[in-house]
C-alpha cells in the first residue's frame, strides 16, 4: 500500500501526510491504510479549492489558467495540511477578520464567498452514516459539511453542494480512479474495511419539559427520578461479577449463586410413553421415485405431463389393498381416494389433449379426507356476548412420546450421498476483488461436497412441493387440485432426470391470514413395509399398490410397492418458509466458513484449499453414546446441512423452546470446560424450561438425546 500511495499521489501531498502522521505519533509503515486515507483527503481538499477564485465584483469564478491581468482572490482558504499551530492561527485570523464563530474542531477549508468553514469527508462506507457521525462530532450549524464517497455518492448540509457540478465531477472521478487502482493491486478490500467511525466525546444529553416528565413517570419501580436511574445504570458494570449485579438489583430478587462443577449437571429427562411418530410433510428416507431420464416428451416441464410420463415407466400396478390402517380414520376412504386418482389419470390419458392442471371430482371420500364441511361454524363474537356459559372449548394436553430409533436413522440417511446431483448454483459473474475469489472458491468446494447429499434432495423436494401447493392454493381456491410431487436432478453422467414421488390433493384454500390452514391428502410411493415400525406410521394409512422388479447383485427380485396416504395441513407462512429451504445451504456454508476463518487466523493465511483438500484430516461432527464422532470435511458439511434441513422440516414451537433454553445450559458447560468457574442460580428452573419442550416431537427428542451424550463426554 505504501508503494501505491507514493506512486499515486503528488509528492507534496505525500510529504504533508507523512508530517501529519508523525505529528500524531503514527507509523506509516504499519498504518498504511491510514496513510492512504490522509493522502486521499488532502487531495480532495486541494481539488475542492483548485481554480476557484473571487473576482473584483465579489463573484465566484472558475479559472483554469492564471490570467496575470486579473486581480483575483482565492475563494477557499486551505486549513487542512498545515501543522496544528499554524492551522489554528489561520482559523483565529479568519474569525477575527470575518466575525465567524470559532469552531470546536479544526475544519478543512474556509469559503470566503459563503463566509463559512467547510468540513470535507471522504468515506469508504455509506455517505449518510459518515455524514451523521461528522455532524454529531462537530455539533455546529456554522460549519458546512460535504461528504464524498468512492462510489460517486455525495452528501452536504441542506443539500448545498457549494461547487459547480463539473468541479465535483472531477473529485468523484479521481476517487473512483483511486478505488480502481487499489482494486487492481488487491488493496481495496483491506482499505475499505479499515475505516473507523468518527471518535466523539460523549456529552450528557439533557431532557427537559414534557419529555422529562414522561421519563420520570416511566421509570422502573423503586426509582424516584431519572438521575437516580441514570446513576444506577452507569454504575452497572457489564462485566462485573454476578454477585455484584444481584446486590444492585431489587430486594425482591432472591438468588443464591451456586458453583457449577463437573458433578452439578444431570442428564435432561426425556419423556416416557409410546414411541414418537413421523410428522414431516413428506416422506424422507422411505420415499420411492418413479423416474424418467433425459425427458423430451411433449409438454416436458408441465408437472401433470411429467407425472403421467413417470407413471408409465412402472408396469407392476395391482389391485390396491390396505396393509396398515390408520387407527382413527375411515381407511376405506383413503383406498377409494387412490383408486379415484388412478381412474382420473386414466381419463386424462384418454383425452385428446392433456390439460395443464387436474381438478379432482368432489367425491365423498375426498370431502372426508380433506375435512370439507368439518370446521365448526365461525360466529362473530359480538353476537355471543349475551351467552352466559360462553367459554373456549377444552383441548387435550398432547400425549407424551418417547424417543424412537427411526429418527436417528432418518438423520443418518440425510447425511449420505446419493448417485444424483441435486443443485447447480448459477455462475454469478467474474470475480473482481480477492475476497470474491475466495468466496467463490469456498462456495465451489462446499457445493461439490453437498450437491449429491440426500439432505439436498429434501431441500429441492420441499421447495417444489411448497411452491406448487402455494400456487395452487391461490389460483384454485375452491378446487380439489391434483398436484404431482416432483423433483429434478442430474445423473453422475450429467443426464437430466425427472422424478415423481407421488401426489397431493389440495382442499379448499381461502387463505386470508398467514396462519390459515389448507388441508391436503398426500399419497407417496415407498418400498418400506410399514409393519416393521408401525409406531412411525401412526398418522398414515398404508396401501400395497404393486410389485416392483429390482436389480441386485444376485439378479432380479420382486418387492411389494406401498402407498403411504395421510391427511395433513399447512399454512401460507409455512409454505413461504418451505419455498425458501435453499437458505439451509447458506446457513451450513456460513458455519463451515467460520471454521475456515478460525483456521486461517491461526495460520495467518487463507486455508480454504488446505481445509477441503487435506483428505487425511478429520473433524468433530457430533456426540454419540460412543464419544465424539469424527469424519472428513465433506461429512462435516453434509452433517451441518442435514441439521439445518431437519430444523426446517421439523420446525415447531417445541424446537424453538428447546434450542433457546438448552443453549443457556450449553454456555455454562462450555464455561466450565474453559475453566472460567461459572456460577448459576435456579438451575432447576432452567431444567424445567428445557424439559417442558420435550413432549412428542421426534427431532427435539433426538436433539435432547444428543445433548445428554455431550454432557456425558464434556464433563468427564
From Swiss-Prot:
Location relative to the cell: Host cytoplasm; Host nucleus
Enzyme Commission number(s) of this protein: 3.1.-.-
Keyword list, A-Z: Cap snatching, Endonuclease, Eukaryotic host gene expression shutoff by virus, Eukaryotic host transcription shutoff by virus, Host cytoplasm, Host gene expression shutoff by virus, Host nucleus, Host-virus interaction, Hydrolase, Inhibition of host RNA polymerase II by virus, Manganese, Metal-binding, Nuclease, Phosphoprotein
Cofactor binding comment, as recorded: Binds 2 manganese ions per subunit.
An example Gene Ontology molecular-function term: endonuclease activity
One GO CC annotation: host cell cytoplasm
Positions that bind Mn(2+) 2: 80, 108
Any GO BP: symbiont-mediated suppression of host gene expression
Motif window: Nuclear localization signal 1 (NLS1): 124-139
Cofactors that this protein relies on: Mn(2+)
Residues noted as binding Mn(2+) 1 in the record, renumbered to the chain: 41, 108, 119-120
Short motif (Nuclear localization signal 2 (NLS2)): ranges: 184-247
Pfam families named in the record: Flu_PA (PF00603)
Location, primary (coarse class): host cell
Top-level enzyme category: hydrolase
Post-translational modification, as annotated: Phosphorylated on serines and threonines by host kinases, including human casein kinase II.
Subunit structure: Influenza RNA polymerase is composed of three subunits: PB1, PB2 and PA. Interacts (via C-terminus) with PB1 (via N-terminus).
Protein name per UniProt: Polymerase acidic protein
